[in-house]
Amino acid sequence: MPPKTEIVRVTPANAAVLDLVAEDVFDRPIDPDLLAAYLAEPGHLMIVAVSQGVVIGQARGMVHRQPDEPTHLYVDNLGVTPSRQREGVALRMMQALFAWARECGCAAYWVATETDNGPARGLYTSLGGDVEAMVFYEGDL
């Protein structure tokens, strides 16, 4: 049985929880200034999964308001250290993001993932979301 895992909403007051992070939870090392700006931003939330004092997973979401659509949760990023995948950690973090989104008045959510990311696609399918094809563009500003 895996060690106990706690799901935590990260705030400026408890951001030190990010001092110990397992491998591959984030894409890059955390920059303290960027973290402070993120946590200060209204409508943004980072959820982490903590086991034995180490962050083993993270999920980030943003409230996306539009003038012509209901308010949505945009799930920006989700990661779980490889050694703790397939234990339901990602599902628990998504459920915590959904609870927060409902508190913020969100009516729905959206998330994107790579077409070849089978585990992520399985998770998002299990949450009842509809698959929609899209094209993604990215560029420097």
Where are these regions (language model features)?
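Conserved active-site alpha-helix within GNAT-family acetyltransferase domains
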Residues: L91, T115-V135
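Conserved beta-strand in the GNAT
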Residues: V48, V54-V63, G79
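A short beta-loop-alpha structural element at the N-terminal edge
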Residues: P2-L18
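A conserved beta-turn-beta hairpin within the catalytic core of GNAT-like acetyltransferases
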Residues: H64-V75, Q85, E132-A133
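Active-site rim helix/loop that mediates acceptor-substrate recognition in acyltransferases
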Residues: D27-M46
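Glycine-rich phosphate/pyrophosphate-binding loop shared by adenosine-nucleotide-utilizing enzymes
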Residues: T5, V54-Q58, L73
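Conserved GNAT acetyl-CoA-binding A-motif
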Residues: A101-A112
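Conserved acetyl-CoA pyrophosphate-binding loop and the N-cap/start of the following alpha-helix
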Residues: R84, G88-A96
